[in-house]
Amino acid sequence: MLVSATEMLKKAKAGHYAVGQFNINNLEWTKSILLTAQELKSPVILGVSEGAGKYMTGFKTVAAMVKAMDEELGITVPVALHLDHGTYEGCYKCIKAGFTSIMFDGSHYPFEENLAKSTELVNVAHNLGLSIECEVGSIGGEEDGVVGMGECADPKECKAIADLGIDFLAAGIGNIHGKYPANWQGLNFEVLENVKKEVGDMPLVLHGGTGIPADMIKKAISLGVAKINVNTECQLSFAAATREYIEAGKDLQGKGFDPRKLLAPGAEAIKATVKEKMELFGSVGKA
């Protein structure tokens, strides 16, 4: 059964581990992540960007697929279906489609407008039993054509957004989406500590989890990060395994061209990546 992300992240914060948000792009992605979460007895958040939602023909299709798959695979661990970096309009579409959690990314609005829109969406989400994440300080890199440099959030602005009653907060601390460049300065733990002081027990979210060294991940968790987003790393694993299968000529052997065979190595690679991350985040056995 799908649930909001509120309880799983409160438990993660209290237990000093993090729950992974793994973004889904299609059936194979969703199935691989759900099966791994079940095998490892880990809670999980399935993230859906607006671009991925559009690719899968719309949020209603995504919600129907995830709900049916959760049931037919016999998944018993907590699963949240979460809109990633949602626009104001996108949040309403996902609420209507049956998502259990939303993220409103108002970081590109003037702060007062971000505050007003966030307030409205918090009320709507909570009235329906959904969890809501908001963002302060844009996350760098590129995601679905949106490019940012990796700003650090203002802790006072974080407090103002947290005080609206959101369930978890994404604060920019120098993290970026996609592959990290060679000249990346690392996570700014001073900013993270200051944000934590301002927002108290609010679970914090680390976007751009791909390529952040394990020691930094563990330190971020010790400072209140309870949700870590991973997308690019699963995509890279999937692409590498699929390339290897085709370069080895396996698609030309027998019925190796059958998509169920062609996509299987990539699906297994996603499982391996998700397992590695769940072990690093400490969520194994926490369902």
Report each predicted region and the residues it spans.
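Conserved phosphate/anionic-ligand binding catalytic regions in large, soluble enzymes, centered on
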Residues: 22, 26
